[in-house]
Every structure is written in C-alpha cells, then in structure tokens.
C-alpha cells in the first residue's frame, strides 16, 4: 500500500474526528493552551492506536465490530449531542462556560476511532504494513483536527449561545451517519 493511499485512508478516517473537533471547540470556548491541543493529540493518538488493535485483535472482535460499531458510535455521540442541545436550550445568562473534561475527550476519541479498528482488521487481511500505516493515520488526524479546532473556535465566537445547540446537532448527525 502506497503512502498516498494511506494518507487518503487517514483523511477518510479523520472526518468524524474533524467534525467532532469543530463541534467541541464551538461549545467549549474557555479552552486554553494544552487543553486545546489535547483534543487533536488524543484524536490522532486514538486514530493511530485503533488500527493497530484491529490489526492484532481483529480476528477476535471483527464480527462484533462490523455488527455493532455504528450503533455504539450513535449511542455515544447521540447522548453527548442530546445533552449539549438540552444544555444549550436551558442556558441562562449566568451560566459558566462549559469545561471540556478529560472524560469527554476520551469518550469522543473512542467514538470517532471505532471505524479505525475495522480498518486495522482489513490491513491484517491484506498484509499491510501497520507500523507504517498507523503513524500516518495518526498524524493526518492530528493535523485535520488541529485545523478543525481553529475553525470551530472561530465559528463558536460568531455563533455565541447557539454554538452548543449546533454542536449537539453535528454530533447526532455524525452518530446517525455511522449507522450507514
């Protein structure tokens, strides 16, 4: 498999992380420094680790992942999205800015990287070089998530209070898309 093919796979895999990063950075407007950078780092890290896990553990979990990955992603992202919409609609003037916790970041990173596990399974079936592929996928996701962070921050500044509702809707749409 060529490097350009791996980069294209990395771009495809990172689209969910890209959208979640935009949605989160619109909502969690008080992030600074390391907290902001932790989002692309974790998303890239998980997108790089999951193909490795899929490569080596795929034969054990392949049928489960193929059958349930879309539903798992929908449930995780749907719950987070519904909660964001609910909080956005109930927001009053004295509400403190939402804080992006490590738990939320980890849940988002796992939810957006489940499909990378399945890609790892296919890499094993095709005898692809996982040690070349995983870092390329991780870096691609990191770079695109970093771009999404800036896009989402600017959009959040412009949208103000509506950003949380829009962010929740985006997460729900990504969850629904994962079913297909």
Give names to the regions the model predicted:
Residues 83-111:
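Alpha-helical multi-pass membrane helix bundles of inner-membrane/thylakoid proteins
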Residues 21-34, 82-94, 145-162:
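C-terminal ends of transmembrane helices
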Residues 52-56, 111-124, 172-180:
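Hydrophobic alpha-helical transmembrane segments in multi-pass integral membrane proteins
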Residues 34-62, 127-157:
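A small-residue-rich subset of transmembrane alpha-helices
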Residues 2-18, 67-77, 129-143:
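Structural signature of hydrophobic alpha-helical transmembrane segments
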Residues 13-24, 87, 112-119:
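Short helical (or helix-break) motifs at transmembrane helix termini and adjacent helical loops
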Residues 63-89, 159-180:
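Selective transmembrane alpha-helices of multi-pass membrane proteins
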Residues 4-58, 124:
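Juxtamembrane transmembrane-helix termini in multi-pass membrane transport proteins
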């Amino acid at each position: 498999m060529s490097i350009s093919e791996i980069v294209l796979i990395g771009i495809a895999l990172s689209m969910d992380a890209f959208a979640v990063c935009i949605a989160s950075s619109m909502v969690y407007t008080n992030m600074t420094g390391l907290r902001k950078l932790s989002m692309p780092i974790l998303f890239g890290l998980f997108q790089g680790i999951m193909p490795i896990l899929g490569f080596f553990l795929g034969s054990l979990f392949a049928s489960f992942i193929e059958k349930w990955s879309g539903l798992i992603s929908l449930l995780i992202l749907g719950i987070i999205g519904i909660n964001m919409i609910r909080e956005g609609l109930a927001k009053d003037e004295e509400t403190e800015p939402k804080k992006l916790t490590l738990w939320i970041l980890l849940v988002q990173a796992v939810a957006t990287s489940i499909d990378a596990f399945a890609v790892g399974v296919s890499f094993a079936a095709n005898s692809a070089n996982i040690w070349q592929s995983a870092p390329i996928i991780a870096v691609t996701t990191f770079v695109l998530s970093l771009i999404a962070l800036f896009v989402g921050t600017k959009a959040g500044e412009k949208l103000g209070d509506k950003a949380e509702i829009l962010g929740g809707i985006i997460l729900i749409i990504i969850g629904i898309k994962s079913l297909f």
